[in-house]
Amino acid sequence: MARPVVAIIGRPNVGKSTLVNRLCRSREAIVHDQPGVTRDRTYQDGYWGDREFKVVDTGGLVFDDDSEFLPEIREQAALALDEASVALVIVDGKQGLTAADESIAEFLRQQRCPTLLAVNKCESVEQGLAMAAEFWSLGLGEPYPISAIHGAGTAEVLDQVLTFLPPKDQEGDEEEPIQMSIIGRPNVGKSSLLNAICGEQRAIVSPIRGTTRDTIDTNIVRENRPWRLVDTAGIRRRRSVNYGPEYFGINRSFKAIERSDVCVLVIDALDGVTEQDQRLAGRIEEDGRACVVVVNKWDAVEKDSHTMSATEKELRAKLYFLDWAPMLFTSALTGQRVESIFALAALAVEQHRRRVTTSVVNEVLKEALSWRSPPTTRGGRQGKLYYGTQVASRPPSFTLFVNDPKLFGDTYRRYVERHIREGLGFDGTPLKLFWRGKQQRDAEKELARQQNRRG
């Protein structure tokens, strides 16, 4: 059984994301003075006592205005309540009871989810009790004074949260999910792709650039395997981004790449590969992440029987440093080939984690040398490749022992990597090759001897 869910509900700027960061001991949720920073529902792992649960942060609820994503935010909040064991309702003690709080209370009474009421921004016990008193009128039960910033009162609220969670023995052991991040420029269809994969309105979709500001985690199961899908904020050039919610969202996106098992790089079929797409591809390769390139909006392209192969050739020419990544042409709008993403991503993750024996590595290297000898300098010095071994996975990394790394230029190094791929596979993952010379090995041995003597 999946971990129970605790939904955080309230109007804009009452401190919901600050409380989420407090409960989850992180700074994943974006906190900013500007109201409406959180739009989609975002999930994090929460812990209290011996219990684990999911905390879902929702956008600020507004019921007297239907502009700028507000209806969609309400829909996202309702979906969060449908799956939650309890809703933790946050109000602002400093500002006091408002008509917006009363509208939210009325909305919650129409839901089946139990509620707990927390009065935030109560920085002292005496002050907090006085501030909380007026919120009894909401009819949501006892108001608990808390300070999300300083942590005061949160222990009492969490103790109450645990009383609403199902018994611990109903929760089974969870297999660690494969983490798949959906990466791309603004408005290439990342959120639409996530919704198509999940079969629900998981993320707010809009033609307005920058609709997704935070990273959105979604846990699903495909082919009996758990996946954690991460929809990220669209990444623009840094000089095009003002300091604020979008800036923090982009930083979260880069962090999502770092903690992913596999990245889905989404390209707009109508725009082709842009300079920013190339930068993102370079970041994925640099961070050593497995990758699948998804060309979205394929339904909008006029095509014949040769269009796909011609387009793939054109795209790969600009994404040459991801030549190892599989490419899939999809339409989030129609659902075309969307499910195929999982098969390609699972294969890429498998290859990313794969290890091969030293004997197999050296069989491939021996064959590479037989087809093409290492280069010789004008002075008559020739590179010698003695042997190689895999030293790490995630990504697969190999150390090649040679007489002098300087004798092996980029062209021959690319040849060796290509031959390793042809002989061993590793589709969907970058490879790291480390070239170690005799002088470097001798120096390391001498250092080890000296350290042993001192010991």
Curated annotation (Swiss-Prot):
Disulfide bridge positions per record: none
Entries under SUPFAM superfamilies matching the protein: P-loop containing nucleoside triphosphate hydrolases (SSF52540)
GO MF annotations in UniProt: ATP hydrolysis activity; GTP binding; ribosome binding
Record-listed GTP 2 binding positions: 184-191, 231-235, 296-299
Lineage: Bacteria, Bacillati, Cyanobacteriota, Cyanophyceae, Synechococcales
Ranges of residues in domain KH-like: 354-439
Example of a GO biological process term: ribosome biogenesis
Protein name as annotated: GTPase Der
Assigned protein family: Belongs to the TRAFAC class TrmE-Era-EngA-EngB-Septin-like GTPase superfamily. EngA (Der) GTPase family.
Complex and partners: Associates with the 50S ribosomal subunit.
Positions that bind GTP 1: 10-17, 57-61, 120-123
Record key words, sorted: GTP-binding, Nucleotide-binding, Repeat, Ribosome biogenesis
SMART domains, per the entry: AAA (SM00382)
